Each structure stands twice: as C-alpha cells, then as structure tokens.
C-alpha cells in the first residue's frame, strides 16, 4: 500500500492532517482504491516521510500556512493514533531524507526558516525516538536530489545554495564513518529534481529546474 499524508488544500494552501491509503489491488475490478487513514497529530505540508519497519512511518518537519517551519516529528501507524517522537534541532523542509541500513534515518539540509536554509544533518534513532546531529553538508542547500546507494551510502546532488546559486555539486554520506564527502559534479545545474538508483548501481538524476529556473526534461 501507499501512504499519502498531509499536504495543503484550499485557496490559502491550508495544511491538512488527514492521510489516505492507496491499495493497488483494491476496488471492484482490482485496479486500485483509496481509503481514509489515521490522521497526523499535526497538520503539516512539505513534511519528510520515511517508512520504518513494522508498517510505521516517520513524519518529520513540514510547515503551516504562515510559513512556520516545524522541527517536531511523529510516528504514523495504520491502525492506531500517531505517537509524537523526538524533535529535530532545526527544520529541514525540502531537504534530503533517507533510511540507512542500520535502521536510522538521515535528514539533511533544507529550509529552516523563511529567511535561511541549513547545512545541518541529523540522524533519527527509531529505538530511542531521538534525533542527533551528524556531520553537516559541505554547504547549506535545499531542493537537492537524494538517493540511497547499493552499498548503504546516500547521494545528495544539486539543489540551491544559500545565495540562491544553482548547484552542480554532489556529495555522499557514509553511515559507517558518519561523514559527508565530495562526489562528482552534475553536467547541468539542477534543483528540485529526483534521483533514482538503478539496478546497475548507477544513479539517474532527472527533471527539476535549471539555472534559468526553466523546467528540465533531461536526465544525468
């Protein structure tokens, strides 16, 4: 099943707390169906979401209508009321979020307020329910593309810098050492794109916008 939670609706883009589950085998003709799910504790849009073991989902951060950025987080479950968990040190809207092989969750970069972005990276421990900081990104950035690599490391590519510069740089987080290190540059500045790890271990970075803020149909 697929969880869709939060977001914004209406003329004023008001955040919602509702969730919806998509069942690909549901419906009369088994073409898929949507059903209502357990609501979040806090209405939020642009939150980070990562599936944890045992059908739990970490929902962290996000924002409300008035551009207040949340550091709070909660654990969503399909059958019971959500449970509040530890808070992040800063907000990470439009950052990168990835589940690591050790079960922890990496949340890095993103927007921390209506005037600044961050290089801070944090790890969520689902056992203790707490966040702790780890090695930061090389610079503050948001709207990056992120992908988990086959060996458990995490690629962070492109995005926007704190001076609104369009980035081609990329870096890799190694959970074994707890550090970020430089990687190759994208041939094209790209922000707001997506990254997908392929079966051969390579990463496809596609779509997003270029340095002129024009939509891209290309891929690297």
Located regions from the model:
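Kelch-like beta-propeller repeat domains
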Residues: 1-220
